[in-house]
Amino acid sequence: MRTIISLLLLSAMVFAVIEAISLEEGLQLFEGERGCVGENQQCADWAGLHCCSGYYCTCRYFPKCICRKDSGK
């Protein structure tokens, strides 16, 4: 009986550690995207708001620079 309880406690501790690590990695990924804007939103490559990953800032109609979807070229 003690063995079963010990195994359950050990597996619960392992699960808690794994969840804590995955949560920390998720928060680090989110911090990199903080303050970014999406498609057709106003951006500024040199300062201020930047485009989220998968988009790039184009200033075709300066001074209104906007984020466009990155085609992967």
UniProtKB/Swiss-Prot annotation:
Expressed by the venom gland. GO terms for cellular component: extracellular region. Residues 1-20 form the signal peptide. SUPFAM superfamilies: omega toxin-like (SSF57059). Disulfide bonds join C36-C52, C43-C57, C51-C67, C59-C65. The modification Serine amide is found at S71. It holds the Pfam family Toxin_7. Residues 21-34 form a propeptide. The keyword Secreted applies. Keywords: Amidation, Disulfide bond, Ion channel impairing toxin, Knottin, Neurotoxin, Secreted, Signal, Toxin, Voltage-gated sodium channel impairing toxin. One of its GO terms (molecular function) is sodium channel regulator activity. InterPro entries: Beta/delta-agatoxin_fam. Its main location: secreted. It is found in: Secreted. PROSITE patterns: MU_AGATOXIN (PS60015). The presence of a 'disulfide through disulfide knot' structurally defines this protein as a knottin. Insecticidal neurotoxin that modulates the insect Nav channel (DmNaV1/tipE (para/tipE)) in a unique manner, with both the activation and inactivation processes being affected. The voltage dependence of activation is shifted toward more hyperpolarized potentials (analogous to site 4 toxins) and a non-inactivating persistent sodium current is induced (site 3-like action). Interestingly, both effects take place in a voltage-dependent manner, producing a bell-shaped curve between -80 and 0 mV. Negative results: does not affect mammalian sodium channels (Nav). This is U3-agatoxin-Ao1k. It comes from Agelena orientalis (Funnel-web spider).
